[in-house]
Each structure stands twice: as structure tokens, then as C-alpha cells.
């Protein structure tokens, strides 16, 4: 979160005829500048552990290459980006981490577009945000059972997607994204959880503070089959259902107050629970595993 703070303070310091910085703010800028520069230099050494680390590293290197006019940082960023972005046409990233790492990836894609001027990166974020509109449950939580990371089956609410919906909704005039911003705050209020981390972004982009959108996102009944991701999601009369390929728990039903998880178990030599090898759609709401 230091980068937007640095951009905000540096923008005010560089602004001709602007309000300038107070003595205290100048001291903060000096410390943050040193931290960001040293951090960017450290990222040049490379090294990552999981897929989402690539995009976090690449996006920060690219942004810092613009801030510090560094060709080395830009070149290092492209060594990661040349691998290709692991977001499929469904909008799902490789780790399928709807509860955490997908939004980390979205932040990285948006930052890459801002730094390079190439809108192709943030299109991956837009695809994922559209997918996420089908991933929230009747109680306002996110469907996380498909994740391959620590957030699997955890109770997580979508508050950290707020700024992504706001940024992309405003930039591309997507009403459902802006309505989802209101819905996220409704969920925050209803669940009595902390609000999204938005203050520094509102300071950095005053245009966000001027936006007024009435009403939240009201999702009608739907049925979607994301074949490349091996998952189907649907909603009927207040409950959601999920069918997944390659999972021992292949069916989930959620009605706001209760979640049902289904598996077929047996015992034959090394085989235990049933896991499908393929998934096909027979008709609307009907799937064959």
C-alpha cells in the first residue's frame, strides 16, 4: 500500500503552483521514497513462490520503472510478463483463489495497464470481476470451495474487490460494477466488518469522490457453465448451486442460512471419494460428470 501513498505525496510535491507539502509530509515522502526505491531494487533480484507473485512483482517493477525512469526495472518486469497471463477466457486465474489471490492479480493487472498504457492487462481483471459477480453467495460471502490456496472453504466477504469494481466501472462505464460497489458496502454494514481500504485511492483520484450511484447490484436467477475452469454456477429462487469437475466435493448448495456439500465416497484399493475426469453440460442446469 506504500506505492499510492508515494504517488500521492510526490504528485503534490511536483505540482507547480500547487498547495505543496508541509514539513511533516516532506519527511514522510523522504522516508517512503527511500523505502520504495530500495524495495524496487530488491525486486530486480527476482524470485517468486506462487503464480500471483509474478504479477505483483511485475506490476510494481513496471510502475517503479516509470517513477524512477529505470530501463532495468522495465526489462525485469517483461521477463515475467513474457510468460503470458494465467487468466482464461472465463476470467479465472490459475490458483482459482476467489477469496484472496484473484483480487491480488486484478490489482496487478490494473496497475500494469496504468503503467504501460496497454489496456490488455486490465481486460483480465474485467473478466475476473464479471466472473466474481456470479461467485457471491446469498449471505454475501464469496464462493471459495474451488480455490487451491488457503482461502478454500473459508468465510470471506468481497470487500477487497471494492476498488477494482470502482476503477473498472468508472473507466469502462460498467453499471453493474458500480452497483456492486454499493452492494459491497451493504454487506460490510450488514456483517459489521471493517470497510474496504479505499481512503488513499480517494485522495489520489479525487474523481472517485464525486461519483454518486444509486442502488446496489441485484442479481437475477442465472446459470453459467465455465467449461475451461471446470465449474458451473447458478441461482434459483434465492439459493445458489455449484457443480465442479475434478473435486471430491463436487456439488454445493447455499440458501443463505445453510450450505450443503456433497460427495460420493467408497473404498476400492487406493480409490476413495469419486472425482470426475470430465464435465459436460446436458441442458440448462443439467450436467454430466
Residue ranges and their predicted role:
Residues 1-123:
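Aromatic-lined, polymer-binding surfaces characteristic
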Residues 119-289:
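Extended polysaccharide-engagement surfaces of secreted carbohydrate-active enzymes
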Amino acid at each position: 500500500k506504500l506505492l499510492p501513498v508515494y504517488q500521492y505525496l510526490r504528485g503534490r510535491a511536483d505540482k507547480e503552483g500547487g498547495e505543496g507539502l508541509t514539513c511533516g509530509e516532506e519527511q514522510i515522502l523522504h522516508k517512503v521514497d527511500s523505502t520504495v526505491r530500495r524495495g524496487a531494487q530488491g525486486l530486480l533480484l527476482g524470485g517468486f513462490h506462487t503464480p500471483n507473485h509474478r504479477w505483483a512483482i511485475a506490476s510494481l517493477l513496471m510502475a517503479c520503472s516509470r517513477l524512477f525512469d529505470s530501463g532495468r526495472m522495465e526489462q525485469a518486469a517483461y521477463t515475467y510478463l513474457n510468460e503470458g497471463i494465467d487468466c482464461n477466457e472465463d476470467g479465472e486465474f490459475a490458483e482459482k483463489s476467489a477469496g484472496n489471490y484473484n483480487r491480488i492479480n486484478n490489482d496487478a493487472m490494473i496497475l500494469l495497464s496504468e503503467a504501460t498504457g496497454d489496456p490488455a492487462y486490465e481486460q483480465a481483471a474485467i473478466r475476473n470481476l464479471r466472473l466474481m459477480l456470479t461467485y457471491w453467495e446469498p449471505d454475501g460471502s464469496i464462493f471459495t470451495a474451488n480455490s487451491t490456496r488457503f482461502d478454500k472453504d473459508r468465510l470471506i466477504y468481497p470487500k477487497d474487490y471494492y476498488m477494482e469494481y470502482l476503477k473498472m466501472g468508472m473507466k469502462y462505464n460498467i453499471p453493474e460494477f458500480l452497483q456492486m460497489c454499493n452492494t459491497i458496502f451493504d454487506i460490510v454494514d450488514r456483517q459489521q466488518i471493517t470497510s474496504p481500504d479505499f481512503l488513499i485511492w480517494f485522495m489520489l483520484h479525487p474523481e472517485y469522490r464525486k461519483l454518486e450511484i444509486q442502488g446496489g447490484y441485484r442479481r437475477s436467477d442465472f446459470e453459467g457453465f465455465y467449461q475451461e475452469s471446470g465449474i458451473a454456477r447458478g441461482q434459483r429462487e434465492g439459493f445458489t448451486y455449484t457443480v465442479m469437475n475434478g473435486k471430491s466435493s463436487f456439488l454445493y448448495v447455499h440458501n443463505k442460512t445453510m450450505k450443503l456439500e456433497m460427495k460420493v465416497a467408497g473404498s476400492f484399493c487406493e480409490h476413495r471419494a469419486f472425482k470426475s475426469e470430465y464435465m459436460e453440460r446436458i441442458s440448462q442446469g443439467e450436467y454430466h460428470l
